[in-house]
UniProtKB/Swiss-Prot annotation:
Name this protein carries in UniProt: Small ribosomal subunit biogenesis GTPase RsgA
Highest taxon above the source species: Bacteria
Family: Belongs to the TRAFAC class YlqF/YawG GTPase family. RsgA subfamily.
Keyword GTP-binding set for record: yes
Pfam families in UniProt: RsgA_GTPase
Residues bound to Zn(2+): 295, 300, 302, 308
NCBIfam families: PRK12288.1, ribosome small subunit-dependent GTPase A
Amino acid sequence: MAKRHLTRRQSWRIEKIQEERAARAARRESRAVEELEGGDLGPEQTGQVIAHFGVQVEVESADGQVSRCHLRANLPALVTGDQVVWRAGNQGIGVIVAQLPRRSELCRPDMRGLLKPVAANVDRIVIVFAPRPEPHANLIDRYLIAAEHAGIQPLLLLNKADLVDESNAEGIDALLNVYRTLGYPLIEVSAFNGLAMDELRGALDGHVSVFVGQSGVGKSSLVNALLPGVDTRVGDLSTVTGKGTHTTTTARLFHFPGGGDLIDSPGIREFGLGHVSRDDVEAGFIEFRDLLGHCRFRDCKHDREPGCALLQALEDGRIMPQRMASYRHILASMPETDY
């Protein structure tokens, strides 16, 4: 069925209804918190948000106990991965009283273009792609820009490596060679037959990771293989579009048996870059960094200007044509006000 396109007024009405519902839920939560704080609460302790359910979160204490908690009204928006201070209640429901500083946060624009955190304290972004649906360098580069902008180490992961055959091997190899040449860590695995899964486990050990990538690349299947017994509801590729059906619904943090954590967040079909500037995009292309600021003109657009350091590097072979094309495509997709 074709996607329904809403008018601006319809979108506004939907947002208004959602805001009113959220406000009513917040008032109910505020009353619940007041009732809890009026009773007996335990001492303050630190914990980590391992799941978010709108107006409530699940918090794991230092000893591994998990509790459902209400949120104080004066708290900033919490996301999975946040470290918090909380107090346990006498009926199994606690209260979050403070958010501890974040070491990092992964953000993306919401439907209105406002920046919204989706995970906190992540130190590794695993960018998952697969032979099917067909991988596109432009989408991978968008994720890399987001990772560089957030200061989070990326790991490129080709899943479904068992689907590489004579029909797609040449294109897949060419794509992988681009990122190997740039020095990005890259692993080829198969959640289906277990290929290189131990190598992946070793790369994830000791890190807080989040998997990103378009639907259908097998993120949930990877989670199920890495964490046996954890069901994240795997969806099949759509027979009509060839794209994946979105199945994971709630961001949740899992512990790997050998150490390290995984935040499994809802599938993202295409990661938006509305929150970054032209300078951020340029900085996200790591091979540009030593060249930026060396053009003849300070306002160089790296298009056809004489004395452009990037164009000279492209001519000399220090910048790959695929990467320059991807850079230009990403800039063309951004609002002109961000240039």
